């Protein structure tokens, strides 16, 4: 328990947040809460559809259900505390609460980054090696892929949480952010953080750049396979399948790399807070919409579920 006992552990920290009490910020807060509600409902609905409809019991939808679960946990880790602080006017967070928020946040973002990379590999196998797909992406392999994403993400979260909470915070208690994010917290440390910066960069390389390189390689090969297809309809179907994943990848990795891979001298709290909204709130809302509205199987499962509910209510 020693890592929790330093100069800031008694009082904790103050989250300055992203909203003030102005009319404009009240409107922005209402918008964020609407986005949070859509993210919550969308991801829960997508998980239920994938779980209950046998037609969606395929590797791609299994990975999608894991992605939705990660997104669901991510928004629930950040937004409720932000809402309580804004509505109550109390912006404090305990030292232990800050550490727990960091642990969950880093674990979920790391897991999602790895899973998105491995989902690109799944699309590559499905398009380039369709005959071998059932063997290469068996149930055992799918469980191993999902399990490894969760395991490495959780390990990354524990490492960064322990390292961040071990630093002394004897100066300002004001975190210029709406949640405990590592780069914002490090600015308050009254010790040399160069070793931690190196550790953070190494974790980001493994959890962001490595899966991103898998995505780039997979889609380069997918593009080559698509161009070799003789049927225009097959090319269109393959590109439609991949476009949803590419949209989700662009939103997630664009925001995460902007926050974690920039040199410290180029970081500005106002920019970081706005960009963080993208992968903590906006991406979890957009993912179920991106993957469902452009997907016939998911929309078919949704219509089937609604029809079942309608018939049940009539009886």
Swiss-Prot record:
Bridged cysteine pairs (disulfide): 98-180
Gene3D superfamilies for this protein: Rhodopsin 7-helix transmembrane proteins (1.20.1070.10)
UniProt gene name: Or2v1
Organism classification: Eukaryota, Metazoa, Chordata, Craniata, Vertebrata
GO biological process, alphabetically ordered: G protein-coupled receptor signaling pathway; sensory perception of smell
Function statement: Odorant receptor. Activated by (+) and (-)-limonene.
Compartments, as annotated in UniProt: Cell membrane
UniProt GO MF annotations: G protein-coupled receptor activity; olfactory receptor activity
UniProt record similarity statement: Belongs to the G-protein coupled receptor 1 family.
Transmembrane regions listed in the UniProt entry: 31-51, 59-79, 100-120, 145-165, 196-216, 239-259, 273-293
Cell membrane recorded as keyword: yes
Keywords annotated in UniProt: Cell membrane, Disulfide bond, G-protein coupled receptor, Membrane, Olfaction, Receptor, Sensory transduction, Transducer, Transmembrane, Transmembrane helix
A single cellular component GO annotation: membrane
Protein name: Olfactory receptor 2V1
Membrane topology of this protein: Multi-pass membrane protein
């Amino acid at each position: 328990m020693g890592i929790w006992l330093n100069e800031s552990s008694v009082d904790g920290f103050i989250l300055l947040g992203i909203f003030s009490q102005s009319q404009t910020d009240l409107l922005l807060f209402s918008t964020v809460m609407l986005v949070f509600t859509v993210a919550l409902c969308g991801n829960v609905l997508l998980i239920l559809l994938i779980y209950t409809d046998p037609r969606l019991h395929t590797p791609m939808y299994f990975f999608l259900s894991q992605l939705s679960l990660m997104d669901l946990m991510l928004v629930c880790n950040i937004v409720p505390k932000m809402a309580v602080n804004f509505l109550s006017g109390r912006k404090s967070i305990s030292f232990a609460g800050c550490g727990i928020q960091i642990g969950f946040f880093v674990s979920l973002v790391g897991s999602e980054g790895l899973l998105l990379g491995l989902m690109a590999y799944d699309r590559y196998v499905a398009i380039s090696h369709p005959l071998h797909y059932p063997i290469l992406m068996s149930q055992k392999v799918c469980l191993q892929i999902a399990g490894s994403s969760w395991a490495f993400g959780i390990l990354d979260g524990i490492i960064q949480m322990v390292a961040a909470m071990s630093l002394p915070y004897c100066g300002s208690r004001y975190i210029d952010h709406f949640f405990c994010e590592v780069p914002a917290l490090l600015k308050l440390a009254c010790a040399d953080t160069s070793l931690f910066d190196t550790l953070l960069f190494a974790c980001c390389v493994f959890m962001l750049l490595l899966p991103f390189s898998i995505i780039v390689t997979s889609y380069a090969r997918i593009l080559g396979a698509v161009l070799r297809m003789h049927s225009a309809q097959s090319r269109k179907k393959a590109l439609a399948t991949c476009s949803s994943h590419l949209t989700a990848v662009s939103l997630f990795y664009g925001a995460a790399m902007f926050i974690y891979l920039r040199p410290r001298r180029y970081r500005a709290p106002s920019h970081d807070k706005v960009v963080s909204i993208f992968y903590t709130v906006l991406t979890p809302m957009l993912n179920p919409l991106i993957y469902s509205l452009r997907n016939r199987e998911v929309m078919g499962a949704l219509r089937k579920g609604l029809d079942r509910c309608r018939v049940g209510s009539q009886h």
